[in-house]
Each structure stands twice: as C-alpha cells, then as structure tokens.
Swiss-Prot record:
Keywords: Ribonucleoprotein, Ribosomal protein. It comes from Clostridium perfringens (strain 13 / Type A). This is Small ribosomal subunit protein uS2. GO terms for cellular component: cytosolic small ribosomal subunit. Belongs to the universal ribosomal protein uS2 family. One of its GO terms (molecular function) is structural constituent of ribosome. One of its GO terms (biological process) is translation. It comes from the Bacteria. CDD domains: RPS2. Pfam families: Ribosomal_S2 (PF00318).
C-alpha cells in the first residue's frame, strides 16, 4: 500500500507541470508527456518518490530530529503553516531571512525581541504606554511574528531535514541547508533543478491542493516517526 495514491495525486492536480517553454531539461526523467503546451508529470514516479521522502522524514522524526517546512509563495503559505503546526514542527511561510539557519545567533536576538513584545502585550505594559508608542510596537511585533512566528522555539542544531515547496523560489533556504549538511525534501515542478534537492517529489508546486496533499503526507510521516520514538523509549 503506497503512502499516496494515483487517485489522490490526480484529484489534487499534482500532474500538471509548467508550460513547455518554461522547463528545466534535468526534469525530463519525471515528465510523462506534453499536452496543450503543458508538461504532464509522470505520477508513477511521484508515487515512488513521495514514498522515499516519506520514509526518510519518518526516520528523521523517529531519531528525535526536527523538520523545518519552507514555502513562501502564496499557494504554499497556508498549507506549510497548517501542516508544520499539525506535526508540531517549524515553518517559514512569508520570507526567508538571510542567516535563518547559518547565522541563528543573530536571528535568535530578533526572536527574543518578539518574545519580549508578546510579554509586554500580555502583562499589560501596552495599556500604560502612550498610544503612539503602542501602535509602533504592535507594528514591529506583527512584522516579527510574520517572519519568525514559525521558528520561535527552533533549535537550529536539531534540524534533521528541510521540506521545501518550490526550490527555485526557496534557493536561499536550500543554500543554507546545504552549508549545514541538512538534507532537503522538495516538491519539484518541471521548471526546477532536481539536482538541488536530496529527495525529489516531482509535482505541481502551484496548486494549493497539490501542495496541501504532499505537505500533509510529510506531516503524517513526522507524526508516525514521533510515535515510533515514543514506543522505543
């Protein structure tokens, strides 16, 4: 029984690639055919590759390591946040700030600032400050929350894998993962370079349902791995 069925992939539109003029020739092995100027992805390959990625993510989770979900394009933002939260993992879904992993000490000072502002809002400090200052602080908090809210509890040294939607868009995140030797699992569309990724899941990275389906399977793998870790203890 495969982790993901052909029926699920078809229903979510995972097979629709990009226009033929916008392709990366390295994706040729994952392309089934061309239809009306659009490449159709070979879903048999997707089934197999999704299974490999699932097993890897499950092992990472079972070993007690964390996974960071990265998807900042509009179609990915919600699914990345929801599935990371469901599996109790970390996510970046608005903007990858340079050094998020490779210069975590600097990022940590901004996370501390966000925590401080959260505290001020909760303990009533905002109620006694001048209105103008509160507006300024709330705007600062919103911006920090948007960029760092998904990694507030992150321990960068315990990241065992990165799951990415659209490696072309998230090249900075992938570059940092490479520097730190963190394996990358990604939904790779027909316009991407599969060689940038350790575990390629060939598929449509522009359809909300397609992203949700695959991100959801990665979250399932994490949850299954965590259960295995608890059983081993």
């Amino acid at each position: 029984m495969s982790v993901i069925s052909m029926k699920q992939l078809l229903e979510a539109g995972v097979h629709f690639g990009h226009q033929t003029r916008r392709w990366n020739p390295k994706m040729a092995p994952y392309i089934f055919t061309e239809r009306n100027g659009i490449y159709i992805i070979d879903l048999q390959k997707t089934v197999k590759k999704a299974e490999e990625a699932y097993n890897f993510i499950r092992e990472v989770s079972e070993a007690g390591k964390d996974v960071i979900f990265v998807g900042t394009k509009k179609q990915a933002q919600e699914a990345v946040k929801e599935e990371a939260e469901r599996s109790n993992m970390y996510f970046v879904n608005h903007r990858w700030l340079g050094g998020m992993l490779t210069n975590f000490t600097t990022i940590k000072t901004r996370i501390n600032r966000l925590n401080k502002l959260d505290e001020m809002e909760q303990d009533g400090t905002f109620d006694v400050l001048p209105k103008k200052e509160v507006i300024k602080l709330k705007l600062e908090r919103e911006k920090l929350q948007r960029n760092l809210g998904g990694i507030k509890e992150l321990d960068a040294s315990n990241i065992g894998a990165m799951f990415v939607v659209d490696p072309r868009k998230e090249k900075n995140a992938i570059a940092e993962a490479k520097i730190l030797g963190i394996p990358v699992v990604a939904i790779v569309d027909t316009n991407c370079d599969p060689e940038e990724v350790d575990y390629v899941i060939p598929g449509n990275d522009d359809a909300i349902r397609a992203v949700k389906l695959i991100a959801g399977k990665m979250a399932d793998a994490i949850i299954e791995g965590r259960q295995g870790e608890q059983l081993a203890e």
